[in-house]
Amino acid sequence: MRYGAVEAVRNLSLSVAEGEAITLIGPNGAGKSSTLKGIMGLERSSGAVSYQGQELKKRTPESLAAKGMVLVPEKRELFASMEVEDNLMLGAFTRFQRREKGLRDDLERVYALFPRLKERRKQLAGTMSGGEQQMLAIGRALMAKPKLLLLDEPSLGLAPLIVGEI
């Protein structure tokens, strides 16, 4: 991954098995966020990115989401002018398209993990605290029932007790 003349990530190879958790640790500017964005096709990269044996280089972020790949970006990227519950349901957009059942049950599971979101389900996302927005971003990702979940700075703004739960 390059930013002009600066090479942010070089010679990186990752392999993640089903059910496995991998952590990228490094100082600011080491390329952790760039790596996640490169995997999701949000930043151009050289080399190859494959998932379940398929090359992803020419895929759109939307098609990757439909394959079950979800990124919770560092800056949350919520729909600030929409209510909490609407943000959560947008996380399940591809499931709506497939007419999947169980969305309400999954919403209740997210509310059980983050009770504060249920209390504030009619509140505009942009008016919430940073920690509440982080809960919402993670909850929205979980609504997609991801096969591959990429979390960039997942504990940002969260209380230590909630970090332990996640």
Enumerate the predicted regions with their spans.
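Glycine-rich phosphate-binding loops of nucleotide-dependent enzymes
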Residues: 1-166
